[in-house]
């Protein structure tokens, strides 16, 4: 038997063992790593957003606010003198180990599912979103119980992989959605008893409350509610693919590792698809560097492909607040000419039988307007993304960008349909809010058992 055959035997044996251990259960409780709560359960100065929404200014603010803020692990600073042996990733790992050795962070003694409640204000009302922190068994090749809706980029994956390999810890969770058609999971997530184990208010004003549940019947009920999946990735595609890559590398190095090794799992925050507090913000498009000719060409194409209605600027936000128009795509546009344009299109752009991804407002905008026009220009305009409509319009008014396009929020049902079909949305099609925090509870990703 050569090396290739031996590896295949080991891989097949491990896959069968994982299946025997887990059965239809794709999630597991775990011994979470958390901040020591002996002094205070308020972790407001210690949690951080996930790495990809931390600006330089916010990073500096978090660092200055608390010497133990988790941003030091989630998004470590680079130094000019960094080398392959000593760099931002090795510093993050050293910080994590230092906090563990000093008791700043502790690992819970018993395995738990951790219930998170996030209370926030949006669209003029208050919301409470609930989810469960759990370990999700990483799929083997060909298994489709974790479904994606978004493509990934090499650079963020390389960054997260180096951090994961250095720390051997999942520092922030992947936000996943369970279809939960019978609302079994949603009902269980609402059963929070007693005072939370930890609370935190983040820089956006979101209040986070965490409960650790260890009762055997409750753990079993959560696993049963999620069952064999599928789970849909809402936020964290790069972290998910990174976890799979890391898992594969660890298996090559440690072919005899147990199926229960922590690297076979990823940390996730799982929410119910039926939770109305599972909000998606619209992500608007700004096109900068068009020039006068490019703006004129975009307006010409806009009128050729869509029904265009001109409105006063006071109506600028109405496209996001209007009721859905069945079978119709509704978009907004602004190019600084004191008018707000409402664009509509229907079956002429997405006929009956069109794929789930082709039927999205964001796909119609890109496929029938932005991408065709940009392809005809000699210059290379820059496409940027914002969630705040007023910021987009201000950028046009300042002359920084030539065109702003406004989208209605993608619906959760659309995300699930695209993922189920195996399609990929255009980049920045979804912005789930609020983000799952980094540092509230993290998980081991080493070869140790979960």
Where are these regions (language model features)?
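Surface-exposed, charge/polar-rich loops and edge strands
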Residues: 2, 10-450
């Amino acid at each position: 038997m050569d090396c290739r055959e031996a590896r295949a035997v080991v891989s097949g044996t491990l896959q069968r063992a994982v299946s025997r251990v887990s059965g239809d259960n794709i999630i597991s409780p775990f011994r979470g790593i958390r901040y020591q709560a002996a002094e205070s359960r308020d972790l407001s100065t210690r949690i951080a957003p996930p790495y990809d929404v931390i600006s330089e200014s916010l990073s500096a603010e978090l660092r200055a606010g608390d010497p133990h803020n988790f941003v030091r692990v989630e998004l470590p600073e680079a130094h000019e003198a960094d080398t392959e042996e000593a760099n931002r990733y090795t510093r993050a790992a050293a910080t994590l180990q230092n906090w563990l050795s000093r008791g700043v962070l502790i690992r819970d003694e018993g395995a738990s599912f951790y219930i998170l409640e996030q209370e926030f204000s949006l669209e003029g009302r208050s919301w409470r979103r609930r989810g469960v922190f759990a370990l999700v068994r990483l799929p083997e090749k060909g298994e489709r119980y974790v479904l994606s809706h978004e493509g990934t980029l090499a650079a963020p994956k390389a960054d997260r992989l180096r951090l994961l390999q250095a720390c051997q810890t999942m520092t922030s969770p992947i936000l996943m959605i369970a279809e939960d058609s019978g609302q079994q999971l949603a009902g269980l997530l609402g059963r929070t008893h007693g005072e939370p184990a930890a609370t935190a208010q983040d820089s956006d004003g979101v209040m986070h409350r965490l409960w650790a549940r260890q009762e055997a019947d409750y753990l079993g009920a959560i696993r049963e509610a999620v069952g064999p999946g599928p789970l849909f990735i809402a936020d964290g595609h790069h972290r998910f693919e990174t976890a799979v890559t890391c898992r594969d590398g660890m298996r090559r190095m440690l072919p005899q590792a147990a199926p229960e090794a922590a690297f076979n799992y990823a940390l996730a925050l799982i929410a119910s698809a039926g939770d109305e507090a599972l909000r998606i913000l619209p992500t608007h498009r700004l096109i900068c560097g068009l020039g006068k000719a490019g703006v004129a060409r975009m307006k010409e194409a806009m009128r050729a492909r869509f029904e265009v209605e001109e409105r006063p600027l006071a109506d600028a936000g109405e496209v996001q607040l209007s009721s859905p128009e069945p079978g119709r795509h509704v978009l907004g546009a602004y190019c600084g000419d004191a008018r707000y344009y409402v664009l509509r299109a229907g079956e002429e752009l997405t006929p009956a039988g069109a794929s789930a991804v082709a039927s999205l407002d964001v796909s119609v905008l890109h496929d029938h307007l932005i991408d065709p026009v940009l392809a005809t220009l000699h210059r290379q305009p820059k496409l940027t993304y914002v969630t705040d409509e007023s910021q987009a319009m201000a950028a046009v008014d300042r002359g920084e960008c030539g065109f702003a396009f406004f989208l209605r929020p993608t619906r959760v049902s659309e995300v699930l349909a695209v993922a189920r079909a195996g399609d990929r949305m255009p980049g920045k099609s979804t912005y789930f809010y609020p983000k799952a925090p980094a540092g509230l509870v993290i998980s081991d990703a080493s070869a140790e058992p979960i």
